[in-house]
């Protein structure tokens, strides 16, 4: 029997790439604001806005074998231009929504289930203009490790920390050739990430054959967090 995976925010970018890679082997449930890119895919769509809606398990199966939370923000501004409301909004979307959903789905998570969250390279590597998003993603890293400890050995919990990835979320940072080249050159591998780079690791962490990795924050960042070659 196919195993069940819940993707929140799986209608574009990294989440969509994960769904494409896993739809043949798993039964995929996607909770997202939009579904136009899902119409010809073998997935179950649940209308859900992580910033405004209350998540329920009404449309979920009895058992879940995997959970991925994909929504995020790239709110890059100097601290003096950020309001407290901006920090609250980033925390709500990136962190508090995860907590709310996890509390709903935990009773459905089976023995050996896997959860995957997303952080950012800017948590481990201090970067200017990242105060709000780094704070929110840092909360995810702490939550992920504590959750992994609390629910071991039943549930594995890991977080992926990417650098800049070419997705709709980062469009304004990569919307012309000059910007793209600057961002490419910042990375030791001389390119920004693609959705498939991150999705490949997420799928690996979800796979039931990968049963000895938990409580980790794994960087997928073209080497930018550890290599200084510029």
Predicted stretch roles:
Residues 152-156, 213-215:
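Short, small/polar-rich loop/turn modules that mediate ligand/substrate recognition or access, typified
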Residues 78-79, 83-91, 183:
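Substrate-binding pocket helix/loop in short-chain dehydrogenase/reductase
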Residues 107, 148-153:
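Alpha-helical segment proximal to the catalytic Tyr-Lys
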Residues 102, 136, 144:
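Active-site helix of classical SDR
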Residues 187-198:
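A conserved structural motif in NAD(P)-dependent oxidoreductases
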């Amino acid at each position: 029997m196919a195993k069940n995976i819940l993707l929140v925010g799986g209608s574009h970018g990294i989440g969509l790439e994960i769904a494409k890679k896993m739809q043949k082997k798993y039964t995929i449930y996607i909770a997202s604001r939009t579904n136009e890119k899902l119409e010809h895919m073998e997935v179950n769509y649940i209308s859900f806005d992580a910033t405004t809606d209350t998540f329920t398990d009404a449309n979920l199966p009895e058992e879940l074998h995997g959970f991925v939370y994909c929504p995020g923000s790239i709110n890059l501004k100097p601290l003096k231009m950020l309001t407290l409301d901006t920090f609250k909004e980033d925390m709500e979307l990136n962190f508090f929504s995860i907590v709310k959903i996890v509390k709903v789905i935990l009773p459905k998570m089976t023995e050996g289930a896997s959860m995957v969250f997303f952080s950012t390279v800017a948590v481990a590597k201090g970067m200017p203009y990242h105060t709000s998003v780094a704070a929110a993603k840092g909360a995810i890293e702490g939550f992920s490790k504590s959750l992994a400890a609390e629910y071991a050995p039943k549930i594995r919990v890991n977080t992926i920390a990417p650098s800049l990835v070419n997705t709709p979320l980062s469009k304004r940072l990569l919307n012309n050739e000059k910007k793209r080249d600057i961002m490419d050159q910042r990375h030791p591998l001389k390119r920004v990430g693609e959705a498939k780079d991150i999705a490949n690791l997420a799928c690996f962490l979800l796979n039931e054959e990968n049963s000895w990795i938990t409580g980790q924050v794994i960087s997928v960042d073209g080497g930018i967090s550890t290599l200084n070659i510029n």
